[in-house]
From Swiss-Prot:
Heme binds at residues 122, 126. The chain crosses the membrane at residues 8-28. Residues 134-163 are annotated as: Disordered. Heme chaperone required for the biogenesis of c-type cytochromes. Transiently binds heme delivered by CcmC and transfers the heme to apo-cytochromes in a process facilitated by CcmF and CcmH. GO terms for cellular component: plasma membrane. It is a single-pass type II membrane protein. Residues 29-163 are periplasmic. This is Cytochrome c-type biogenesis protein CcmE. Keywords: Cell inner membrane, Cell membrane, Cytochrome c-type biogenesis, Heme, Iron, Membrane, Metal-binding, Signal-anchor, Transmembrane, Transmembrane helix. It comes from Methylobacterium sp. (strain 4-46). The gene is ccmE. It holds the Pfam family CcmE. The lineage of its organism: Bacteria, Pseudomonadati, Pseudomonadota, Alphaproteobacteria, Hyphomicrobiales. One of its GO terms (molecular function) is metal ion binding. Residues 1-7 are cytoplasmic.
Length: 163
């Protein structure tokens, strides 16, 4: 073989090795690329206990029960299925019934999702109270221009405080 042919074979071999490596990495990550699963997907797939994943949906109205030692149970729904969730810890300020939520954790044998982390989702119109106050103070707040009312202050337990 000439020098040019050897160089082409070398480049082709390196390209094939990189393509195989990339394919293996993508195949290994295929189960973790999904941002979250809905309660309907969990019901269809019958996830085994102990498998970690992210659960996303809305906090079902009337399902939040606060227990001792920061224990909270609630249900996540996608309006087609519901999944009970157990969480121990402080909830985000935006957590409330009817609000979007993403919980990370694993299924327990009884069909309850045990969350280690709970994230509250909000839409693009949410504005923290501190930002709204700063805009009002600087004179840039435009009343009635589509800005939502600022979120009420909350205690460490997530309860709304009286203004």
């Amino acid at each position: 073989m000439t020098r040019k042919q050897r160089r082409l074979v070398f480049i082709g071999t390196c390209g094939a090795v990189l393509a195989v490596a990339l394919g293996l990495v993508l195949w290994a990550m295929s189960g973790t690329i999904v941002f979250f699963r809905s309660p309907s997907e969990i019901a269809r797939e019958a996830v085994a206990p102990g498998v970690r994943f992210r659960l996303g949906g809305l906090v079902e109205a009337g399902s939040v029960v606060r227990g001792p030692d920061s224990q909270v149970t609630f249900a996540v729904t996608d309006n087609a299925a519901r999944l009970p969730v157990r969480y121990r810890g402080l909830l985000p300020d935006l957590f409330r019934e009817g609000q979007g939520v993403v919980a990370e954790g694993a299924m327990e044998p009884g069909g309850v999702f045990r969350a280690d982390t709970v994230l509250a989702k909000h839409d693009e119109t949410y504005m923290p109270r501190e930002v709204a106050d700063a805009l009002k103070k600087s004179g840039r707040w435009q009343e009635g221009a589509g800005h939502p009312a600022p979120a009420p202050p909350r205690t460490a337990s997530g309860e709304a405080r009286a203004p």
